């Protein structure tokens, strides 16, 4: 996944698997 890909700003966290952003709700 593109490290600049944000699913939701503010709640997105940097996944240690490679800079993958995961949406936390």
From Swiss-Prot:
- Organism domain of life: Eukaryota
Q: Does the keyword Membrane apply?
A: no
Compartments, as annotated in UniProt: Secreted, Extracellular space, Apoplast
Q: Which GO terms describe its cellular component?
A: apoplast
Q: Which GO molecular function annotations are given, in alphabetical order?
A: metal ion binding
First and last residue of the signal peptide: none
Enumerate the UniProt keywords alphabetically: Allergen, Apoplast, Manganese, Metal-binding, Secreted
How is it modified post-translationally? The three different mass spectrometry results appear to arise from different glycosylation variants.
Please state the protein's primary subcellular location. Answer: secreted
Kindly list the residue ranges recorded as spanning the membrane: none
The family assignment reads:
Belongs to the germin family.
Q: What does this protein do?
A: May play a role in plant defense. Probably has no oxalate oxidase activity even if the active site is conserved.
Quaternary structure, from the entry: Oligomer (believed to be a pentamer but probably hexamer).
Name recorded for this polypeptide: Germin-like protein
